[in-house]
Amino acid sequence: MGFFSEFKEFAMKGNVVDLAVGVIIGAAFGKIVSSFIEDVITPLLLKPALDAANLSTIEQLTAFGGVKYGLFLSAVINFIIVAFVLFLIIKAMNHAKKKDVAPPPPPAGPTQEELLTQIRDLLKNK
């Protein structure tokens, strides 16, 4: 077996392909979730804090060395959403793989003629 054929066999194994798909989907979906969190969720969460501090923008809230808890919340929410969606994708892929694999056929037992032959031989020996 040559080097390239061994590499091809390794690369085409299910685990390597699944890992590659997971990384690509995770990166692409991560950007979507980041945009959703930063552009939609974070402003909604920080709006009450801005109103309480009589400020108009998020930048004013952190201009004087304030804690950027909004960025931390954004990262946490981002991680939770990406992890949950990847869990659902992997669960669906595993479910699909289980359907594709046919159960092995039951072991072939002796035929009726073989059983009758065995019974006849046992009766002869008595």
Curated annotation (Swiss-Prot):
Lineage, highest ranks first: Bacteria, Pseudomonadati, Bacteroidota, Flavobacteriia, Flavobacteriales
Primary role: Channel that opens in response to stretch forces in the membrane lipid bilayer. May participate in the regulation of osmotic pressure changes within the cell.
Family: Belongs to the MscL family.
Keyword Magnesium tagged: no
Residue intervals passing through the bilayer: 17-37, 70-90
Keywords attached to this entry: Cell inner membrane, Cell membrane, Ion channel, Ion transport, Membrane, Transmembrane, Transmembrane helix, Transport
Organism: Flavobacterium johnsoniae (strain ATCC 17061 / DSM 2064 / JCM 8514 / BCRC 14874 / CCUG 350202 / NBRC 14942 / NCIMB 11054 / UW101) (Cytophaga johnsonae)
UniProt cross-references to Gene3D superfamilies, sorted A to Z: Large-conductance mechanosensitive channel, MscL, domain 1
Subunit record text: Homopentamer.
Record GO cellular component, one term: plasma membrane
InterPro entries per UniProt: Mechanosensitive_channel_CS (IPR019823), MS_channel (IPR001185), MSC/AndL (IPR037673), MscL_channel (IPR036019)
Gene that this sequence comes from: mscL
Subcellular location: Cell inner membrane
Gene Ontology molecular function, alphabetical: mechanosensitive monoatomic ion channel activity
SUPFAM superfamilies, per database record: Gated mechanosensitive channel
Coiled-coil segments on the chain, per record: none
Major location (coarse): membrane
Membrane topology: Multi-pass membrane protein
PANTHER family referenced in this protein's UniProt entry, alphabetically: LARGE-CONDUCTANCE MECHANOSENSITIVE CHANNEL, MECHANOSENSITIVE CHANNEL MSCL
NCBIfam families named among the record's database cross-references: mscL
Protein name, UniProt field: Large-conductance mechanosensitive channel
PROSITE patterns, alphabetized: MSCL
